[in-house]
């Protein structure tokens, strides 16, 4: 799975002018499933998100996880993270999982996250969403998790 996480002081997602998810301080996580991903990969991504130390400690160093900082997670599906722009001016999204597989993995990711942390908010899979955020830092980190890969 491909994730782009941003440390935020606040974030929300809206669909058709209706607020569907909102957090205060925490992580906004844009996520995309790839065809080779499984439920175990989604679980591994949640583990990484909850343990990654991107929040400041009392000395000002990034040494606290979202759990330790008491922050929220706002998880939003975004298949465009799998874009391949190497073949011209129009991106290809063939690196993203098919929609139904993506939906199943997104729901697994949410269920696992909610079983291990609170609050966990989300966007609406497949919807045209407006994501509003105040980036804190800014801290923006790409994260790729899979059976054969773990970056960074």
Swiss-Prot record:
Motif position, Gly-cisPro motif, important for rejection of L-amino acids: 137-138
GO MF annotation terms: D-tyrosyl-tRNA(Tyr) deacylase activity; Gly-tRNA(Ala) deacylase activity; Ser(Gly)-tRNA(Ala) hydrolase activity; tRNA binding
Catalytic reaction annotation: glycyl-tRNA(Ala) + H2O = tRNA(Ala) + glycine + H(+); a D-aminoacyl-tRNA + H2O = a tRNA + a D-alpha-amino acid + H(+)
Summary of the function given for this chain in its UniProt record: An aminoacyl-tRNA editing enzyme that deacylates mischarged D-aminoacyl-tRNAs. Also deacylates mischarged glycyl-tRNA(Ala), protecting cells against glycine mischarging by AlaRS. Acts via tRNA-based rather than protein-based catalysis; rejects L-amino acids rather than detecting D-amino acids in the active site. By recycling D-aminoacyl-tRNA to D-amino acids and free tRNA molecules, this enzyme counteracts the toxicity associated with the formation of D-aminoacyl-tRNA entities in vivo and helps enforce protein L-homochirality.
Signal peptide: none
Main localization category: cytoplasm
Organism, scientific name: Methylibium petroleiphilum (strain ATCC BAA-1232 / LMG 22953 / PM1)
Enzyme Commission numbers on file: 3.1.1.96
Recorded family membership: Belongs to the DTD family.
An example Gene Ontology biological process: D-amino acid catabolic process
Protein known as: D-aminoacyl-tRNA deacylase
Cellular component aspect of the GO annotation: cytoplasm
Tagged with keyword tRNA-binding: yes
Domain writeup: A Gly-cisPro motif from one monomer fits into the active site of the other monomer to allow specific chiral rejection of L-amino acids.
Places the protein is found: Cytoplasm
Subunit structure: Homodimer.
HAMAP family: Deacylase_Dtd
InterPro entries xrefs: Daa-tRNA_deacyls_DTD, DTD-like_sf
Keywords: Cytoplasm, Hydrolase, RNA-binding, tRNA-binding
């Amino acid at each position: 799975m491909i994730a782009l996480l941003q440390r935020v002081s606040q974030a929300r997602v809206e669909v058709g002018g209706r607020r569907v998810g909102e957090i205060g301080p925490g992580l906004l996580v844009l996520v995309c499933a790839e065809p080779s991903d499984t439920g175990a990969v989604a679980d591994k991504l949640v583990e990484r998100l909850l343990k990654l130390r991107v929040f400041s400690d009392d000395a000002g160093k990034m040494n606290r996880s979202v759990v330790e900082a008491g922050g929220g997670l706002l998880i939003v599906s975004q298949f465009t993270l799998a874009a391949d722009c190497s073949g011209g001016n129009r991106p290809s999204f063939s690196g993203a999982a098919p929609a139904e597989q993506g939906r199943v993995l997104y729901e697994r990711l949410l269920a696992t996250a909610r079983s291990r942390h609170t609050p966990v908010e989300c966007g609406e899979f497949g919807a045209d969403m407006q994501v509003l955020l105040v980036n804190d830092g800014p801290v923006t980190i790409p994260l790729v998790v899979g059976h054969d890969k773990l970056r960074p």
